[in-house]
C-alpha cells in the first residue's frame, strides 16, 4: 500500500495517470505518432490547393476523408463492444502507416493526382471509423481507478494538441523546403512508435460480449440507450452541431492564410499552431481538475467561446490578431470536446461504451465531411470570411440551446454521480444540483 502511495506522489495531480505503466507507454507512443499525423493533416489540404487552386476541391477531399466515419462508425462501435479493442487498435495503426507511405510513394514518383488523394482519404476515413471509438474506449483499460479516467482523457487531449501545436509548425517548414512528400513519409514512419508501444503493453484480455445479437439490433439498442440519457443525447447533439458548422474553418485555413492574410505555408502552419496552443491550454486545465463536477457549465461556456472566436476571426485581416483569435478558438474547441468526452466516458455503462463513443465519433468527425463540403461550396459563393462567420453564429446558438437544458441535465446526471461516489448520497438535493453538472468550474 505504501509503495502505491509513493508512486502516486511522484506525479503532480495534473499528471497522475502517469502512475500507470500502460498509460505511460501508450501516451509516449501516441505522442510521437500524432506529431506525424498533424504534419500530414497540414500537408494534405495544402497540396490539394497547390494542385488545383479550388476551395471546392479542398472541401471535397475533406469530405472524402470523413464521410466513412459517418457511415461506418456506428457499426464499428458495435464491433468495438464485441471484439478486443487492443487488436483493433494495433490493426488500425498498421493500416494508417501503409496509407501514409502510399501517399509519399505517389508524391516522390511524380504521379500523385487529386483523385489519388480522394481515394486514400476515403481509406483513411474507414480506418479512423474503427480507430477512434476503439482508442477512446481503450483508455478505460489503461487506468485502474475510475476517478483517474477524466485525467487520462484530458492528458490524451493535451497529447493531441501538443502534437497539433508542433506538427503544423514542422509541416510549414517541410512544405517550404522539401515539399509535401516528406510530410507523408515522416507520418508513415511515426506509426512505428505507437505500434511498438502497443506491443509493450501488459493488458488483461477484456471480456468480450458473448451474447451477440444481429449488428442492426445491437445498433438499435445503442441508439435507444443514447436517446434515453438526456446528458449523453444533448452532449452529442452539441458536438455534432459544432463539428458540422464550426469545425470546417480548418478546411478553409489555406485559403484564409493565402488570400486574406496574404501569407504562405508558414502562415497556415502558424495559424493552426496557434489554435493548437489554445487547445493544449484547455486540455491541461481539464487535466488539473479533480473530477468531472462542473463539466456541464464548461461545455456550454466553451462552445460559446468557440463560436465567438470564429465570429471575430472572420472579420480579421491582421496576422497577429488572427493568431490571438485562433488561440481562443482552439481553447474553446478543446474545452468542449474534451469535457464532453470525459462526461460521456464517466457516465456510460461499459457494455455500451463502444457504441456511445462511436456516436461521439460520428458527431465529432462524421458530421465534419458535410460541413467541409458545404463550407467549400459556400466559400465559392459568399467568400471564406462570411462562411466562417455563419458557422460561428450557429455554434453560439447551439450553445444557448444547451445552456437552456442544463437544469434538466443536472437532474439526470445526479444519480449517476452519486452511484460513482463523486457526490455523497446524504447531501441535500438542492446542494447536489448546484454542485455537479453545471457547478462553477473552479474545483
Q: Would you name each region that the model predicts?
A:
Residues 2-23, 203-237, 421-431:
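Juxtamembrane intracellular "pre-TM" segments in multi-pass secondary transporters
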Residues 24-44, 65-80, 84-99, 116-176, ...:
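Substrate-agnostic recognition of the 12-TM MFS/MFS-like secondary transporter fold
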Residues 45, 100-107, 171-176, 194-202, ...:
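Structural signal for membrane-spanning alpha-helices in multi-pass inner-membrane proteins
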Residues 61, 71-75, 82, 88, ...:
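C-terminal transmembrane bundle of multi-pass solute transporters/carriers
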Residues 137, 141, 180, 184-214, ...:
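Helix-loop junctions on the cytosolic side of multi-pass membrane transporters
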Amino acid at each position: 500500500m505504501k509503495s502505491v502511495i509513493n508512486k502516486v506522489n511522484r506525479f503532480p495531480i495534473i499528471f497522475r495517470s502517469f502512475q500507470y505503466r500502460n498509460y505511460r507507454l501508450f501516451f509516449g507512443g501516441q505522442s510521437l505518432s500524432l506529431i506525424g499525423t498533424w504534419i500530414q493533416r497540414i500537408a494534405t489540404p495544402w497540396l490539394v490547393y497547390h494542385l488545383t487552386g479550388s476551395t471546392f476541391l479542398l472541401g471535397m477531399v475533406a469530405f472524402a476523408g470523413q464521410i466513412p466515419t459517418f457511415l461506418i462508425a456506428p457499426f464499428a462501435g458495435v464491433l468495438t463492444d464485441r471484439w478486443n479493442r487492443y487488436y483493433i487498435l494495433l490493426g488500425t495503426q498498421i493500416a494508417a502507416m501503409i496509407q501514409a507511405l502510399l501517399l509519399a510513394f505517389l508524391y516522390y514518383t511524380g504521379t500523385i493526382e487529386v483523385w489519388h488523394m480522394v481515394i486514400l482519404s476515403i481509406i483513411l476515413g474507414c480506418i479512423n471509423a474503427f480507430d477512434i471509438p476503439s482508442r477512446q474506449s481503450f483508455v478505460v483499460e489503461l487506468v485502474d481507478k475510475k476517478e483517474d479516467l477524466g485525467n487520462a482523457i484530458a492528458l490524451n487531449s493535451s497529447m493531441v494538441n501538443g502534437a497539433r501545436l508542433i506538427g503544423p509548425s514542422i509541416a510549414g517548414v517541410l512544405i517550404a523546403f522539401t515539399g509535401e512528400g516528406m510530410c507523408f513519409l515522416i507520418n508513415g514512419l511515426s506509426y512505428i512508435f505507437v505500434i511498438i508501444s502497443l506491443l509493450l503493453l501488459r493488458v488483461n484480455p477484456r471480456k468480450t460480449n458473448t451474447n451477440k445479437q444481429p449488428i442492426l439490433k445491437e445498433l438499435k439498442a445503442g441508439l435507444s440507450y443514447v436517446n434515453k440519457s438526456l446528458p449523453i443525447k444533448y452532449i452529442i447533439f452539441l458536438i455534432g452541431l459544432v463539428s458540422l458548422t464550426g469545425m470546417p474553418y480548418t478546411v478553409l485555413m489555406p485559403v484564409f492564410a493565402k488570400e486574406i492574410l496574404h501569407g504562405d505555408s508558414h502562415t497556415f502552419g502558424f495559424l493552426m499552431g496557434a489554435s493548437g496552443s489554445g487547445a493544449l491550454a484547455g486540455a491541461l486545465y481539464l487535466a488539473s481538475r479533480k473530477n468531472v463536477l462542473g463539466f456541464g457549465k464548461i461545455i456550454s461556456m466553451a462552445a460559446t467561446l468557440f463560436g465567438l472566436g470564429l465570429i471575430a476571426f472572420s472579420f480579421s485581416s491582421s496576422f497577429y490578431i488572427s493568431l490571438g483569435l485562433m488561440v481562443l478558438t482552439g481553447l474553446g474547441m478543446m474545452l468542449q470536446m474534451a469535457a464532453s468526452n470525459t462526461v460521456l466516458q464517466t457516465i456510460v455503462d461499459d457494455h455500451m461504451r463502444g457504441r456511445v463513443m462511436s456516436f461521439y465519433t460520428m458527431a465529432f468527425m462524421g458530421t465534419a465531411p458535410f460541413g467541409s463540403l458545404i463550407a467549400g461550396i459556400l466559400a465559392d459563393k459568399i467568400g471564406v470570411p462570411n462562411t466562417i462567420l455563419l458557422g460561428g453564429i450557429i455554434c453560439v446558438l447551439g450553445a444557448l440551446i444547451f445552456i437552456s437544458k442544463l437544469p434538466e441535465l443536472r437532474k439526470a446526471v445526479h444519480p449517476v454521480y452519486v452511484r460513482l461516489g463523486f457526490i455523497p448520497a446524504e447531501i441535500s438535493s438542492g446542494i447536489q444540483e448546484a454542485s455537479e453538472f453545471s457547478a462553477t468550474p473552479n474545483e
